[in-house]
Amino acid sequence: MKKITFLKTFIQTRWLHHFKSREAVENYQKKQLTNYMDFLKRESPYFKNGVPSNFDHMDKAFMMEHFNELNTQGVDRDEALSLAIESEKTRDFTELKGEVAVGLSSGTSGHRGLFITTAKERSMWAAA
């Protein structure tokens, strides 16, 4: 776990993000979405040239179909899926490619999904 990231996120979540109005929340959300889209344009092969004109929405089927182009870590879907399935069987959740961990969604929709997280992201989730 990244302790500095954990502490920073915990402090921000606990003491610094107090919104006084709906407008303040919406402004914060817009800023965060802009930052996220800038990140995707820089890091995700799928979004390098912006949002495609035919892009409608993101669901599990779309994400799994375009996993290799969407993810920002260069992780191959088939490799990650094999590792995640093996990890589920053995209960050995070894990381893939350094700090990237792989997991599976429960598959309650009938289709299992794949997710990857970095050590930084896991620290932020734990703190929030």
Regions found by a protein language model. Name each.
Residues 1-104, 110-127:
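Nucleotide 5′-phosphate-binding alpha/beta core
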